[in-house]
């Protein structure tokens, strides 16, 4: 065996040893830290592939967003009801207290900051995508947005997000005053917003995007479905109305209407509210489906069977692996989100709950998440954490165990031949800075900031 063959074999053994070492560290981490650590570098990402038993959660989680005047405004709180575990996600590099979460898709969140800028934020990888400005929309003249008296943010009544975890393609829909604007990124096509022309000047009450179709309730109380499977230009498919046929008389407090699409593609209208004005009054819901004869939502249903409904996502999911059947997972309504009312504030204190449709009763509450915390939370959402095959490698403040492992990995690399790789640049920061992988040299990290 030649010297070069011996060195190559030795290098392969050392590389395998490092991967094994990293895998042992990854197996000790919590679920959240595991998915944070897998994006440290390509070595950690490869090692994470061989860790057994780490999969996407089968039950929805709760995310809580901090209110203003908190010490660590770059953090948020996660709660896994199935495992009864709480996680604090810190150092997001994003001011969560002065921003609003408008929608989510998997682990991606559509954030709207105080400067009226949109961002897509992945909680676990810290990846961030800045969306185009709203000042000009597809040739439209500058739109006059409705602002609160404080002038702190633009009022957006409703938004929807869909992200493909593998390709990073996405759709974003927003209701801006009487417009519904949307932005679609596929490949390198990522430069503008467009107005949904068929419903221009109508506005919307709620909308859901599922399987390339946008389901939308307009302010005129009509349901319209648009098919985006052909690309950016939608095709209007069908229309129905619900109007006064949906029962709201049972609610004495302000009620709200939501749209949901079941596993079979059936559209539901959900109306919720409180029976009286007392703080002790619980949320109640009415669920209606369409009458095929009249094309109106006049059929009151008492059960959705072996499915569960997540109002924040506007979809139903199979009731299995810990997901409760015939239930509505509810967190907050659009009125309180827009007003920024604290989740610990009187009427809003018990918003996070699971409501069983058949029994017409709240079967699970999560008041302890807010009342036991010294930090005020302005909003909460149900979401399904998902982790795609891609990772955007970053430098951030790491878990102490990860830091210790990286030091050990670095010490084991001493004396090995440096590896040279081509420089690649990934733009992912709001301020225009770039995260890039530099050519490596002995004893130096592969990732740096320019």
UniProtKB/Swiss-Prot annotation:
InterPro entries: F-box-like_dom_sf, F-box_BR-signaling, F-box_dom, KIB1-4_b-propeller. Keywords: Brassinosteroid signaling pathway, Cytoplasm, Nucleus, Ubl conjugation pathway. It is found in: Cytoplasm; Nucleus, Nucleolus. One of its GO terms (biological process) is positive regulation of brassinosteroid mediated signaling pathway. Component of SCF(ASK-cullin-F-box) E3 ubiquitin ligase complexes, which may mediate the ubiquitination and subsequent proteasomal degradation of target proteins. Required for brassinosteroid (BR) signal transduction. Mediates ASK7/BIN2/SK21 inactivation both by competing with substrate binding (e.g. BZR1) and by promoting its ubiquitination and subsequent proteasomal degradation. Residues 20-50 form the F-box domain. GO terms for cellular component: cytoplasm; nucleolus. Disruption phenotype: Abolished brassinosteroid (BR)-induced ASK7/BIN2/SK21 degradation, and BR-insensitivity. Suppression of the constitutive BR-response phenotype in the dominant mutant bzr1-1D, and accumulation of phosphorylated BZR1. Transmembrane segments: none annotated. It comes from Arabidopsis thaliana (Mouse-ear cress). This is F-box protein KIB3.
